[in-house]
Amino acid sequence: MAHKKGVGSSKNGRDSNPKYLGVKKFGGEQVLAGNILVRQRGTKFKAGANVGMGRDHTLFALEHGKVVFTNKGNKGRFISIEVAQTEVAAD
């Protein structure tokens, strides 16, 4: 007979840290250059006009303007920035 009680080790009991992925700025929102639009794994969304992509596939605004989402079918879903036209007053 054993003199010590058998101690089992659990294979569960751990969890990864949250990654906070997803859309950060939605369609129609005004953004500043550098604002993060989407954090994603892979290219669920692709970069359209005035949008850059980081090395972890994060999409960010390159210009000030309004966020626009477009679905181009087989080509995928694109996010672009519609730059606001600034009118110059004539003196």
From Swiss-Prot:
- A molecular-function term among this protein's GO annotations: structural constituent of ribosome
Any Pfam family: Ribosomal_L27
Q: Gene Ontology terms, cellular component aspect?
A: cytosolic large ribosomal subunit
Gene3D superfamilies the UniProt entry points to: 2.40.50.100
Output one GO BP term.
Answer: translation
* Record keywords: Ribonucleoprotein, Ribosomal protein
Q: Which family does it belong to?
A: Belongs to the bacterial ribosomal protein bL27 family.
- The protein's name in its UniProt record: Large ribosomal subunit protein bL27
**UniProt organism field:** Deinococcus deserti (strain DSM 17065 / CIP 109153 / LMG 22923 / VCD115)
